[in-house]
Amino acid sequence: MKITDLAGSNFPELSAQLKGDAATIEIGGITADSRQVKPGDLFVAVAGSKADGAAYIADALSRGASAVVAGTGTPAEAGAPVFAISDPRRFLAKAASSFYGRQPETMVAVTGTAGKTSVASFTRQIWAHSGFSAAMIGTTGVVAPGRTEYGSLTTPDPVSLHKLLAELADEGVTHAAMEASSHGLDQRRLDGVELAAAAFTNLGRDHMDYHPTVEHYMASKMRLFGALLPKGSPAVIFADDQWSAEAIAAARKAGHDVRTVGRNGDFIALKRVEHFRHKQSAEVHVGDDIYEIHVPLAGDFQIANALVAAGLAMSTGITAKAAFSALERLQGASGRLELVGQTKDGALAYVDYAHKPDALANVLESVRPFTTGRVVVVFGCGGDRDKGKRPIMGEIASRLADVVIVTDDNPRSEVPEVIRAEIMAAAKGATEIGDRAEAIRAAVGMLKTGDTLIVAGKGHEEGQTVGSVTLPFSDHAEVRKALGGL
């Protein structure tokens, strides 16, 4: 493929530089990591939070890069094909899309602070129950027929993403649901994906170490509607969040077919919910039709996630009857209010990914209706991340749980004792146990009939990062081990 094919009509400032010999440059691959450059590759130099790709242009050229695309103002390399444009990140995404050239026919993306993984997972399951070969891409990795791969990023980099989409298409996958993180949207990682529909779940405090304000955080998420979703496409929005009105306004301004779901929804209207220990039932209205739905998962927020997923499925050709029928067979996403086991006395032990204030509040509130005893929570806060949320989460835990144990959760380069102290300052009556495994053992050991334990923060993760080293650690495994020792 020639570099002119990648520039196309989307990047006239690049096309204007591709004259003479430059127009004939052949591209054998694309990367934004100079260490991965192979002879004939195109190196796209993007500025990151820790390093600027422009500093590695010489390294990329020495490894055989056939050309370099970098940001405006990048110094020219003598005799080297270095082309400067205003938005190399967007070019990287579009170029990766053009280079790999294939994706599943029906793609949807979901953004929001919480619920992205569950919505993507549920949408995939609804499609699959309707007979389609379907995949999901997100925080827990990739799930598709014949493959389950753990991933570390909610939204992969553009090159990895489009390579994956091409592989899925070649494997016969026709439908795919993916998470769209604020980082991924802000960094243009999804700009080359062709979407059939998109969704918004909610907005709460998160990534304040990256976004200067919550308004910037919301604006990054709204790029999904304003820049990526084709005009006139369905935009499914959860209607009961404090930021729903802003999301609806953004989607309407972009010219989309807005479809709201929830208690205030007009596409899928939630009229009644009954909570049970391991399941929920609800009445929903779609137009003049009334449906009784059953979701085999605990937690009010899972009803919200299920409705958003049903909205996406219905917006991509699935009937309401088929979508709601599929909800009865849902399997929860790994580490999302996942029941790991119970004591001999029947106390339940869950693992949940809640690592931000709203998510912690949601999960603690969700288990209260079926908890006849005490709600016990074990949690911590990550190092080198938003420090402002630590006392907020401490207050939430002490207010909504009966027993709180504060422990470590990926302290990274920070001093664990300092992180715990910042949480404990607002966590009235909490117990501090730094060793996470010991904290889990202590929590399980105190459980009585009717109690519910939530081990929050890690969910599906299988490591504890201390300093620069990630040590093997699984909340699931530690909970099972503690239950087995009773």
UniProtKB/Swiss-Prot annotation:
Main localization, broad class: cytoplasm
Key words, A-Z: ATP-binding, Cell cycle, Cell division, Cell shape, Cell wall biogenesis/degradation, Cytoplasm, Ligase, Magnesium, Nucleotide-binding, Peptidoglycan synthesis
Single GO MF annotation: magnesium ion binding
Annotated positions binding meso-2,6-diaminopimelate: 385, 409-412, 457, 461
Lineage: Bacteria, Pseudomonadati, Pseudomonadota, Alphaproteobacteria, Hyphomicrobiales
Primary role: Catalyzes the addition of meso-diaminopimelic acid to the nucleotide precursor UDP-N-acetylmuramoyl-L-alanyl-D-glutamate (UMAG) in the biosynthesis of bacterial cell-wall peptidoglycan.
Name of the protein this chain belongs to: UDP-N-acetylmuramoyl-L-alanyl-D-glutamate--2,6-diaminopimelate ligase
Catalytic activity: UDP-N-acetyl-alpha-D-muramoyl-L-alanyl-D-glutamate + meso-2,6-diaminopimelate + ATP = UDP-N-acetyl-alpha-D-muramoyl-L-alanyl-gamma-D-glutamyl-meso-2,6-diaminopimelate + ADP + phosphate + H(+)
Cofactor(s) this protein cannot do without: Mg(2+)
Binding site for ATP: 112-118
Modification after translation (UniProt): Carboxylation is probably crucial for Mg(2+) binding and, consequently, for the gamma-phosphate positioning of ATP.
Matching SUPFAM superfamilies: MurD-like peptide ligases, catalytic domain (SSF53623), MurD-like peptide ligases, peptide-binding domain (SSF53244), MurE/MurF N-terminal domain (SSF63418)
Listed GO CC annotations: cytoplasm
Motif extent (Meso-diaminopimelate recognition motif): 409-412
